[in-house]
């Protein structure tokens, strides 16, 4: 355990966050996401919700400021519905740490899968919410 690191951030996830460069993307997936069939770098975060991970990551991770939307979530399939509280929980977790929230874009289901294939890694969580996946894009960490 390290001081200042959220307990939900595993050593493996901390290593991946440090390895990522600006513009790299990380998928935080729900428990139903086909992570192992679409990506070779999968980190398990069983029993931990996406909002909890977003809170921990937001303290360590600068979101990309040079794109319109550094967050991407899956659109509902036609005829299906989204629970707006899922996005609200995720943004509240980020806002708790950063004081503001980046913009979220909605991506068609299969386009989301294609984008996830090119991500730096996929973190499969214990999140049970339908359409509970989010892609986050890393930005440039400011020098202080």
UniProtKB/Swiss-Prot annotation:
The active site is at residue 22. Its main location: cytoplasm. It is an enzyme of class 5 (isomerase). It catalyses: alpha-L-fucose = beta-L-fucose. SUPFAM superfamilies: RbsD-like (SSF102546). InterPro entries: L-fucose_mutarotase (IPR023751), RbsD-like_sf (IPR023750), RbsD/FucU_mutarotase (IPR050443), RbsD_FucU (IPR007721). One of its GO terms (cellular component) is cytoplasm. Keywords: Carbohydrate metabolism, Cytoplasm, Fucose metabolism, Isomerase. Belongs to the RbsD / FucU family. FucU mutarotase subfamily. This is L-fucose mutarotase. The gene is fucU.
């Amino acid at each position: 355990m390290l001081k200042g690191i959220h307990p939900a951030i595993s050593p493996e996830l901390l290593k991946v966050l440090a390895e990522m460069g600006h513009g790299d993307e990380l998928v935080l997936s729900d428990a139903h996401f086909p992570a192992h069939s679409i990506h070779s770098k999968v980190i398990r975060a069983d029993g931990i919700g996406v909002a909890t991970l977003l809170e921990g990551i937001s303290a360590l991770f600068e979101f990309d400021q040079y794109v319109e939307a550094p967050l991407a979530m899956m659109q509902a399939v036609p005829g299906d519905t989204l629970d707006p509280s899922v996005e609200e929980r995720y943004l509240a977790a980020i806002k708790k740490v950063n004081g503001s929230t980046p913009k979220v874009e909605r991506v068609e289901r299969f386009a989301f899968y294609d984008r996830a294939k090119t991500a730096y890694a996929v973190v499969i969580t214990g999140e049970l919410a339908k359409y509970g996946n989010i892609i986050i894009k890393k930005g440039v960490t400011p020098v202080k």
